[in-house]
Amino acid sequence: MARPKKCRRIEFIPKNTYFMPIGKKRCKIEEIKLRLEELEAMRLKDIEGLNQEECAERMQVSRQTFQNIIDSARKKVALALTKGSAINISGGDYTTHHCKFKCLDCEEVYNINYEQDRQKCPSCGSQNVICIKKMGSCNKKCHKDND
């Protein structure tokens, strides 16, 4: 029996999720489904330029799992481009919030949501907050603290 899939962490959810060649009717086009974690793998590796280990750490998966995800993603995109198929970005096994922050004023510990990127404490409103993990897990806030 196969193990259940662990949720992969993603930091980006695209606003545009459907791409198709111009001049083809939607009802007559083959569609390839690109899962959100596959898009995230390509974004981290190809756009942010991270190495495999850094990508795997950000997505909270092993290096081998990351490699499997990105291989699948690149194959799907290549197939869509060469066959003239549509790309539908949706679904997957992912989560968007895992990073814990702590307010230095009231001691509140809370999760941030990457989509909202909370920079102030939800309890007292203080902006005197820090990332508990600090190991690249919450890149948005940690990066701002290091500037």
UniProtKB/Swiss-Prot annotation:
InterPro entries: RNA_pol_sigma_r3/r4-like, UPF0251, WH-like_DNA-bd_sf
Database matches in SUPFAM superfamilies: Sigma3 and sigma4 domains of RNA polymerase sigma factors
Sections of the chain in a coiled coil: none
Family to which this protein belongs: Belongs to the UPF0251 family.
HAMAP family to which the protein is assigned, alphabetical: UPF0251
Name of the protein in question: UPF0251 protein NT01CX_1491
Lineage: Bacteria, Bacillati, Bacillota, Clostridia, Eubacteriales
